[in-house]
Structures are given as C-alpha cells and as structure tokens.
C-alpha cells in the first residue's frame, strides 16, 4: 500500500512539473507580448508626429490604417480561426497515437486549401477596395490602405493554421516566443522607419511582422513534422 501511495505521489509530482514547465514559460511570454503590443500602439502616433504630421493628423492616419483598414484585412483570418482552433486537439491526438503519415497529409491539405482561400480573397479585396471602403466607411479614404494591405491575408491565414498545428504538436511555447520576437522586430522597425518615411514605415512593419511570423512558424513546423517524420 505504501509503495502504491508513493507511486501515485510521484506521478502527481511528475504531472505537476510537466504542467508548470508548459504554463510558466507561456505565461511569461504572454505577459511580454501584451506589454510589447501596448508599447507598439503607443509609439506609432508619436513617431508620425516626429515625421512631421500634426498630432491630430497623425492620430487620424493611424486610425485609418490600424483602426479601419487593418480590421477589414483581419476578417478572413478570423474566419479561419473559427475552425483552426479545432486543429489543436486533433493534432495532439494524432501525435499521441504516432500517426505521422496522417499528420503530414493533413498539413499538406490544410496549407493548399488555405492558400487557395487566401489568394481568392486577396484578389477580391484588391479589386473591390473602393466598394468595400464606401460600403463600410462611406468614403474612399481607406481604399488604398485596404488594397496595399490585402496580400497580408495570405501570410495571416497560413500563420494561423501553422500556429494551431504547432500547439497541437506540443510547441505552444515556440509559438509564443516567435510572437514576442515578432513584436520586438516590429517595434524596432516602427521606431526607426516612421520618422523617415512616415506611413510607409507602418506598412513595412506590418509586412515584415506577418512574413516573419509565418516563416518562423512554418520552419518550426517543417522541423517538427516534415523533417523528423
């Protein structure tokens, strides 16, 4: 009886250690990400003023990009999120069962379908940017930003899929770490570029951010799935 009790205690301690090993790093990186994200939003209008915009115009342009155009670009990614979260338990189950072949097959299909979906929407958004801006905002002020930012849809959606697959494959810490690194890179770009090229600095930062995030996640997925399996 004592040996069984000791074994149960050891199992509980081992389980607790595993939980702490996962949750503590994720909690720390989550806090860092939240703080960096707030700082990023704070410096954009300040740097636009440094570029030469009056404060009111700086806030206005910031609002057009981040508050109006960018949320439109985010809609396809939000649609993807509604089912991509279901990939976490699915891939966790496949990993536990050692079903490597099915993991690879599903990954390939998901990336192909997501790419087709994203590229189709990019074409629609770019072609109908004026109509979208008029319908939603009753002006054309955001149409150029919608058109310029539309290609980001592809990287956002693919990154969403890659991140949730990685979480299912017990790589949630890596996902959070890449998000923190991404924010640091974005802040550096915003800090140094906006005072020299204004709005262009924001556009470049958004592109670098999304491309880096997807590339890092995909390379991690490649190492975890395609290379090792």
What do these predicted ranges mean?
Residues 31-76, 93, 133-137:
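Helix-terminus/linker motif at the lipid-water interface of multi-pass membrane proteins
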Residues 125, 174-199, 209-220:
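Alpha-helical transmembrane segments of multi-pass membrane transporters
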Residues 18-34, 67-70, 74, 114, ...:
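Residue-level signature of transmembrane alpha-helical cores of multipass secondary-active transporters
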Residues 120-138, 196:
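Short membrane-interface helical motifs at transmembrane helix boundaries
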Residues 151-179, 192:
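Membrane-interface junctions at transmembrane-helix termini in multi-pass inner-membrane proteins
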Residues 1-9, 41, 163, 192, ...:
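C-terminal transmembrane helix end/exit motif
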Residues 16-20, 66, 99-116, 120-128, ...:
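Interfacial transmembrane-helix starts/ends
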Residues 73-98:
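Helix-loop junctions and terminal segments of transmembrane helices
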